[in-house]
Each structure stands twice: as C-alpha cells, then as structure tokens.
Amino acid sequence: MTPKEIVLGGYKSFAEGDMEGLGKIFHKDAYIKINGDHELSGTYRGFDDFLNNCLAKLPAKLPNLEADILNTIAEGNRVCVHIHWTADNLDMYSIHMFVVEDGLETEFHIFDDSQKMAEALSG
C-alpha cells in the first residue's frame, strides 16, 4: 500500500469506530502532536497514549463528530489531508500531516483551528 492509501485507510477505520484497525497502522513509538493550547493539545507517544488520552474523549467532548476529507496530497512518505470537521458543537477546518515509514505512521501532526477547538471543548 502507498502512504496515501495507508493514511486514508486510517480515516476509514476512525469513521467506522474501528480503533483496533486504526492502531495497527501506527508505529509503536509514533510521535503525535496536536497544536494549540487546549485540553487535547500536546504530544502523544504511541497509539495507546493517543487513544486513551485523546481519541477516547472525543465522543463526549465533540458529539456526532464527522470528518469530510476535502483534499489529500502525498509526496514520498509524507501525506497531508485537508479536512472539514463537524460536530454538534464544532465547525472547523484542519490539516493533518503524516510521515509513513515501512507501512506505518511514524508521525502525525494535527493543525486544527485551535481557537475553535478550545471553544468546543470548553462548552
């Protein structure tokens, strides 16, 4: 699979609620960084850290969260995804940047509209 196919497969797993499948595409020591200064901002090491300390909180914090992928650009082992996120309390655009090595995501940088995200998380 290409890096782009791996990344897009991850969004499919996320949309289906398949966290086990999503976790399989992350390197065990993956570096995950969420920009901003809100409760989910920061650095996560490995998928389990990301799952337990970020993803597991999303259903309660962002009810009915959905991602609409607008565009995907891949060059070499880097993939960038432009996304429109909606939830009951959120309408936001973001960019996700991935590094894929040997079939696994080793880096995942989340560039959200952190002001909108902070407002949604605090509400």
Language model regions located:
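Short, surface-exposed coil-to-beta transition loops
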Residues: 66-67, 90-96
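A solvent-exposed, acidic/Ser-Thr-rich amphipathic alpha-helical stretch
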Residues: 27-72
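Short, well-ordered alpha-helical segments enriched in acidic and aromatic residues
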Residues: 6, 18-33
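Short beta-strand edge/turn micro-motifs at domain boundaries
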Residues: 95-119
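Short, solvent-exposed coil/turn segments at beta-strand boundaries
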Residues: 25-26, 74-78, 98-105
